Structure formats: structure tokens, C-alpha cells
Amino acid sequence: MARTTAINRYRNIGICAHVDAGKTTTTERILFYTGLSHKMGEVHDGAATTDWMVQEQERGITITSAAVTTFWKGSRGQYDNYRVNVIDTPGHVDFTIEVERSLRVLDGAVVVFCGTSGVEPQSETVWRQANKYGVPRVVYVNKMDRAGANFLRVVGQIKNRLGHTPVPVQLAIGSEDNFQGQVDLIKMKAIYWNDDDKGTTYREEEIPADMVELANEWRNNMVEAAAEATEELMNKYLEEGELSVEEIKAGLRARTLASEIVPAVCGSSFKNKGVPLVLDAVIDFLPAPTEIPAIKGIHPDLIDVPKDEVKPEQFDERHADDDEPFSALAFKIATDPFVGTLTFVRVYSGFLTSGDSVINSVKGKKERVGRMVQMHANQREEIKEVRAGDIAALIGMKDVTTGDTLCNADKPIILERMDFPEPVISLSVEPKTKQDQEKMGIALGKLAQEDPSFRVKTDEETGQTIISGMGELHLDILVDRMKREFNVEANIGKPQVSYREKITKSNVEIEGKFVRQSGGRGQFGHCWVRFSEPDVDDKGNITEGLVFSNEVVGGVIPKEYIPAIQKGIEEQMKNGVVAGYPLIGLKAAVFDGSYHDVDSNEMAFKIAASMATKQLAQKGGGVVLEPIMKVEVVTPEDYLGDVMGDLNRRRGLVQGMDESVSGRVVRAEVPLGEMFGYATDVRSMSQGRASYSMEFSKYAEAPSNIVEALVKKQG
């Protein structure tokens, strides 16, 4: 089957923004104008097509990135048919993992700002992530009908706060209740939208007299920006003082793809004024899959080599071409009530037909592709093949998680792995009834497969199920999904910190002896173990787990009991020696002991080793470690004092400060135990203008007052 749309007419784009900039409404309008969706969904009614989870509709926020395939021929039918794959991304800080995951597979982005509130903290986070992946973007200033909306003010904020060069290609005609349309600076015409067809068509008129001067000024700014693309255009502009419409578009496009500028448009999605021109801007200024750098990857043999040690010549490249070997990245897993697991993939090279077998090169497993569907929000269309540049969902994948690569078995490659941050907050969840117990296990397993930043484990001592994630809202929503999608009722505990323990002395020799001999068959286990603190590398990372060695000579302990001694030490490590938290690492050598011909058995030696390990609290200088987070707070200068004072109160150590376009960036290391509720506190301290990000840095010794409280709690 031949390709239906040429690859240079593909646009893989994301709609990115902070909460409430009107991103979902904008996506809805895109679906409407591209002819797929006949009734516009409104977020207020909880009916938007891309917000397809019940929680999203209730909270009016977007959680999952739904990928939607649409087609666009231009607001005036001026193009051949373009295929636009739209990925809707969430805007809440706890879901930055979703945004990051989407940006990874996009070629370009439309960043939506609110005409009234402009650049907000979360938009700075999204902007930084887009910079990290080098995503070219177009800015759409939405909600121009709102009180206090001002297009040029937001353009100024993008320049000053985000440090990018926005180039308006439109101006707003009127604002607030009087917002009527746009001035198209490329054609130098005024555009007014028809309400009868919900803003599908528009009429062009002359620019209002009171705007001509402003329009000329901003047009010159735009033409100059376009002329700087090449020497040729610059020379023509200097000689003739003007460029043709085609030259302006070509110049702006080249500079947008190089991430030197961002074209800016405006409108009101809710009032149906302007979205078709946003789509035109996507076609005019954002890249096709063939215009972005080839994706790099490594051979599966190099999977264990640290990223920074892979030599440049060891990287493999895949170009967006049907003739190259097949490669695709799984960027999202979703559970669908009707078909089971959907694996969303972005195809980078080659093609795949349903029924083909591929390998998951990260896990080294073979997968057979059953059915393939292309999603239109929550409806789906079955397709027979996917080609380079496509985004589709595969059904029937057995063991694929987010970030895995699917490829040809004879040309394996691992595309760049996404870095998922370690979860920092944990809660205990307990099923309310026996029936819920089994369902909860299945539900948590599925949710963990969908979301790599969410982990599940069982606390061996209490038997409780512990879930960990990226923030309080993140876990709230997962618990909520468990209730709704899987009908599991659960009781939720308070947020907990994951503490660890370690010893601080080396070459400590401890005897463990377990004897029970009171008639009949007894128990006898006796060992001497030399314990040492774990090794630490030059970056301060502790060697985790047990490093065990057997130095017994002369058969004083028979060989078959040595594994039991190792097991006894490992089990006691899990339960800790000071306050009941796992030992992070330990070196142990068994070097002496004795046994009894009749009474010795594996169990006795296991208990003896465990008893020896328990004594480490006193004899080995046992300490409790707490997780230390690397915290970055971006705050306007006015609130710097408050933010610094607050970090000190939280036992934070300020590591340094930088200037940034968004204000001051404070870098600090703060114990996680002091960071609960910080999202709310930092917002109220700075009237919502400061934003922060936090990731795990290291484990460090906890102060004595914390340790005392923990020991007391363990009783």
C-alpha cells in the first residue's frame, strides 16, 4: 500500500500550555475545523473530545496526552491535503512527565498563552522542556476576548521572561468584548470571522485607519526577521526594502526551524475567532518529519554503558524514510475498556504492517503487532500499516513500557531513552474489602505500566501496598482512576518519606549464635561475620545491596550453610537495624563459626546471621539516611527574601543562584521530609509567580531529632 500523504506534508505537533490557557478548547476547535468533530466540545460542560477520562472532565484539566490525527487544506483551501497529528499535553506541574514524554516525539509545538495572564510559572517549565528537546514552536495568544487581554504585552513577556524572540505575524483588532479579528501582517489585510459558520470562514477587508501605523511598524519588524534568514534575502531587503509573501514565509520558516524566532498569532478559541489561522501557521512555519535532525540511537549491546561514555561514532542514526529499517518509540501506554492496552508509538523510520513481528530492543523481547489504530481522541479507526512520521496506537503488545524502542530484529537500535525522574512521595493504600484486594493488584499493575514515574511495592513488615509518584496531585489522580476505572475502593494513608539506613564503621567483627537444645532435635547455628560500610564512588553514590564473601577455612561451617548466612543478612538488611528502614548497602564476610552434626540446619544459620546483623545498630555505628532533593525555585526578585528564608526553615542548603529571564533561580538541597505542601506554600509566598522543580539528589545522614522521632514511631 503506497503512502497516502507525502511525508513533507506531515506535521506532528503538540499543543502545550499551562493550566487554563485554553489549550483543550483550542484542540477541540482544531478537530472541528479539520472536519472530524461536528459538535464542538466545551470544557465547561465536561464534554471536550480529547479529555476522555472522567477525572479530566470533572476537574477541567487534561491529564493524558491523547494523540489525534487530522487533515488540513488551509483556511482558504490554499494547500494540498496536510496530515496533522495533534498531541494534547497536560499543563499541571505534577504531570510534567507527560509533557516531557510528548515533546520527545513531537516535531513542533503550538504554545498557548492566555491574553490576560500571559507567561505563567508553568508555561516557563513547558518552555524549558521544549528548549531541552529543541522543539520549534509557534505562539498562540488565546482568550483575546477576556478582560485585560493584550496581545503585544504577552509578546513582550515572552521576550523578557522566556528569553526568546517572538515575531508577531498578526495584530489583534480590538480586545476584550470588542475583539473582532486580526490584522494579517503578511498580506496586510484585516480579517473578520463569520459567526454563522462558527468561524470557519472569514472576510478580508482593508486595515482600520487607526491601526495602519502600528501595522506598518510590526510588519517591518516581521520582514526584517525574515530577511535575516539568509544573505540572499537580506540583500534583496536592503536593496528593495520589501520581500514577497513567499519570501517572508520562507525566511520566517527557516528561522523558526532553527529555533531562532517564534512566530506569534492571536485569537479567541472559545469565540471561534482565529483557530484556522493557527493551523495555517502550523503548516507555514513548523517542520515536517524530514526537516528535523535524524533521530540517534545505540546498539542494544551498549545498553549498560552510561550515556556520557558512549562515543560519537557508536551512535546510529535513523532518517524519516520508508526505505530505512523500521524503528519506533513507545511514548505512551493507555488502558482502554474495550480493546485492552493501547501502545502509542511514533514511527521514526521504515514501515510496519499489522501482523508483523518486531523486537522490543530495550527488553530484548519479540512482539507481534496485532491490530493498529489511529486515534481521534476517544474514537478510533483501524489501519493496516504505519510509515515513517506516523503516530498510531498498537493493540496487543505484551511487554512494552513507556520509552521502549520497537524495531526490526535484524537491525536493532535503542532510540534515546527518556530520563524519568525517581518518584519522591509515597502513600500507603489498603483495599477496603477482600474483593478489592485482588482487583487493586491488577489496577496498580496497569497504572504502573502506563506511567513510568509511578511505582508500586509491598512493605514486607506491614504487608501494606505503597505507591510512589511525582507529587501529591499525581497520586490523588491515580487513586481516583483506580476507583473509577477498576472499581477498587481503598483507604489512603498519609504521605511518607522513604528513609534508609547505613553503618559508619568498617571491619566490625560480630558473633551470631542461635542455640536451642532441649530434648529431641535441636537448632544450632553459629557464625562470625566481619561487616564494613558500603563503598562510595567519587560522585558520592553508595554501592547498594549486599556485597557478600565467604572466608571460612577448614570447613568450620559446611559449604551448604553459607547461602543461608547470606540470606539471613539480606533479610535483616531489609528490616534495618536502627529504626526499621532498609540498609542501603553493606559489605559482609563470614570468616568463622561452628556447627553441630545433628542440630545444625539452614534455618538455624539464617537466624544466627540475622542476629549478628541486628547488633550493627550499636557496634557498627548505624545511622538513618534521609532523601535529599535537588530543588530549583524560579522566583521574581521581589519574593527572593521570602523564598530563601523559607528554604532555610526547611533545613535547606542553598547551593547557588543564577539570573534568568524569569527572575532569580535559587538552587538548593532540601530534605524531602520538609517539602510536603511546598507547591501550595511557594505559590502563596509569591502570589503564584514562583515555580519550582524538584528531583532526587542523594541520601544523607538525618539529624538526631529526626532519628529519635522515627525510632519512637517504630516503638
Swiss-Prot record:
InterPro entries according to UniProt: EFG_II, EFG_III, EFG_III/V, EFG_IV, EFG_V, EFG_V-like, EFTu-like_2, G_TR_CS
UniProt cross-references to Gene3D superfamilies, sorted A to Z: 3.30.230.10, 3.30.70.240, Elongation Factor G (Translational Gtpase), domain 3, P-loop containing nucleotide triphosphate hydrolases, Translation factors
GO CC annotation, single: cytoplasm
Keywords: Cytoplasm, Elongation factor, GTP-binding, Nucleotide-binding, Protein biosynthesis
Presence of the UniProt keyword Ribonucleoprotein in the record: no
Pfam families: EFG_C, EFG_III, EFG_IV, GTP_EFTU, GTP_EFTU_D2
Keyword Cytoplasm found: yes
tr-type G domain residues: 8-290
A GO molecular function held by the record: GTPase activity
GO biological process, one term: ribosome disassembly
Chief place where the protein resides: cytoplasm
Positions annotated to bind GTP: 17-24, 88-92, 142-145
Subcellular location: Cytoplasm
Role summary: Catalyzes the GTP-dependent ribosomal translocation step during translation elongation. During this step, the ribosome changes from the pre-translocational (PRE) to the post-translocational (POST) state as the newly formed A-site-bound peptidyl-tRNA and P-site-bound deacylated tRNA move to the P and E sites, respectively. Catalyzes the coordinated movement of the two tRNA molecules, the mRNA and conformational changes in the ribosome.
Assigned protein family: Belongs to the TRAFAC class translation factor GTPase superfamily. Classic translation factor GTPase family. EF-G/EF-2 subfamily.
Name of the protein: Elongation factor G 1
Gene that encodes the chain: fusA
